[in-house]
Amino acid sequence: MVVLGVLLLVALTSRTGSQATGADPLRIRIPTIEVDAPVQPLIVDENGVLPPPDTYDGTGWWRDGPEPGERGPAVIAGHVDSRRGPAVFFRLADLSSGVRIFVDRADGSTAVFTTQRVERYGKDAFPTDAVYGDIPDPELRLITCGGEFDRKDRRYLDNVVVFAVLAG
């Protein structure tokens, strides 16, 4: 089960410097790790927490942030696994720099990103500014759970974050 509860304060950076263009993400493809999944919009809850997507085989895009390919950090989250087994972002931590990520958008275009790095952060030390903070260029952040699984609380202790830049 993915717990994205550490993603506090996201409302502070909504659509910073970005205008909605009608290019909402519809699908994300990462051939290297066999991801080809729909994207649903996500909004933060009353506590400022970005919830996980409704399904284990789909992903969710932070709707109040930039659209993938627009200025700023677009954020897409997905589950790592479920009680039944691997989920959409099960192999996300296996990515390395230089991998292509394709985001199909509602306007018919595809934003292509290249991974820069993959990091793992404890949920109690999640780098909110590095993930959601205002930046001058179009970038993408992919988030899932990782690290040790706490069986008592039924949650992972870490988040895996992929940082990617728009391919030029």
Language model feature labels by segment:
Residues 5-112, 116-168:
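Solvent-exposed, non-transmembrane regions of membrane-associated and secreted proteins
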Residues 1-2:
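N-terminal Sec-pathway targeting helices
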